[in-house]
Amino acid sequence: MSNVKDFLKRKDIVITPQRYLIEALGAMAQGLFASLLIGTIIKTLGQQTGLDVLVDLGGYATAMSGPAMACAIGWALHCPPLVLFSLITVGYSANALGGAGGPLAVLIIAIVASELGKAVSKETRVDILVTPLVTIFSGVGLSMLIAAPIGAAASQVGTLIMWATEQAPLVMGILVSVIVGVALTLPISSAAICAALGLTGIAGGAAVAGCCAQMIGFAVRSYKENGVGGLVSQGLGTSMLQMGNIVKNPRIWIAPTLASAITGPLATCVFHFEMNGAAVSSGMGTCGLVGQIGVYTGWVSDIAAGTKAAITPVDWAAMVLLCFVLPAVLSVIFCEIERKLGWIKEGDLKLN
């Protein structure tokens, strides 16, 4: 037993929640931001300005999300070079086969492949062959075995969302907003789920509100700890960056989730806020302002179809309030209550 412990220590294989659920998960979120999310922002900018070069550039970046996440995980696990480079293939396969659960599949599979690769690294005279073979075979093999089931499990969130859309507007607003918002922050793809469900209309509006509550909520309430960089990366990128901190203290998730439970029914019952653009926009929130652009293109389409007379000041006010103002104000209020209760403290929202 002592020999095993000595071997694991020598290989820097540390099997702890801190290493896997905080360090690896936090790094994975940064990898996602540096590929899918920044690519989405660039692509959206290109689409709105008519610059095809930006659309292409953004497309290349988003296509590399799996490899980027896997390499980020490998970096967090202190993988040697050959293991780290081999994770590019592992990340691609896990993300491609994982569907809506792609990020979660990458997390699980890349961790296993990383540790197996580290275990054999520099143990043979043909390390240049053995290490990549073990890392890639184990990672791609696991991807073929479990990535699709992980994706199917993540897609079950869609079943819950569809049930929620059948409820009364008040209840539907709360449930859809909270569920899609939570899915956006988790290492699964809320955008893929919404796209698969064709989530538009009033339910799409509630989903947009829920996603914005998470992203803007985390961005604004953590401004003191993360500054402008954190404000932009979370507000225009993803609240998934906070997953490592959520694992350490789940109570930091309460404020934005409560905010989404308020903005959702306001969207459905008060403002009749609809998202009639591409369904994928319902699960994007303020990432690259894709959610808001989806709402706007929906307005334009409705006008062209004759179902909407014009875009009114009330429409713009609803978007600004539901997507930016209320998520910021409500999350800060709830955050201060949590601080007074001693549930969260300085540094709990700090991003590395």
Label each PLM-derived region with a short phrase.
Residues M1-N352:
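Pore-lining transmembrane helices
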